[in-house]
Design a protein with these regions (language model features):
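Conserved PLP-enzyme active-site core in the AAT-like
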Residues: 1-103, 118-122
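Active-site-lining helix/loop region of Rossmann-like oxidoreductase modules
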Residues: 99-124, 129-133
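Residues that cap or flank secondary-structure elements
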Residues: 20-21, 109, 154
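Conserved C-terminal alpha-helix-loop-beta "cap" of PLP-dependent enzymes
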Residues: 122-178
Length: 178
């Protein structure tokens, strides 16, 4: 981000960070602005657990004012995207709750869940099974995932059959195939 900010600043172009899925950790509420972003957009849904059609726009006052000019009660392009008073109250409550969560404890809880899953899956014919953190793509980065490397030949099924069987299970399991 720092390199993008440097290049954008040389050209007087504002940097807008789509941080919709960058929570947790809570420190991300400030980190992108600290690194020089001009605007940062967070989802009010997702990990914040507020109303799904809400969000938080943070950043430079002049850019916030320009965005606000597009919203209710004005007739800008954002008029159709207004949120109700009830949704705003829900978002405020969700944000207050979100910042009070002990995310270190949550992360440990997630790791324990992953360890249980990993233990239950050890009987599957796979070439590798581990707990890992995403380095790209999947968000948020602090959420651990159970990673399996499956050899379809060893299982006697192709990847689409495996995916289909997992999706139809109880509970359903969504997979990302690389």
């Amino acid at each position: 981000l720092k390199e993008i900010v440097r290049l954008a600043n040389e050209r007087a172009v504002p940097v807008i960070v789509d941080a919709a899925a960058e929570l947790p950790p809570v420190c991300n509420l400030q980190s992108f602005l600290s690194e020089g972003a001009d605007l940062v957009i967070f989802s009010g849904g997702k990990a914040m657990c507020g109303p799904n059609d809400t969000g938080i726009l943070c950043g430079r006052a002049d850019l916030i004012k320009a965005a606000r000019a597009q919203a209710f009660p004005n007739a800008g392009i954002g008029r159709a995207l207004k949120v109700s008073k009830e949704q705003i109250i829900g978002l405020i409550y969700a944000l207050q709750r979100f910042i009070k969560i002990d995310w270190n404890s949550e992360q440990l809880r997630w790791e324990k869940v992953c360890e249980k899953i990993l233990h239950r899956l050890k009987s599957i014919n796979c070439t590798n099974i581990s707990i890992a953190y995403a380095t790209h793509g999947a968000r948020p980065l602090i959420v651990p995932r159970v990673c399996l490397t499956i050899d379809p030949i060893m299982l006697g099924k192709d990847l689409s059959q495996i995916d289909h069987q997992l999706e139809r299970g109880k509970p359903a399991i969504a997979v990302v195939m690389d």
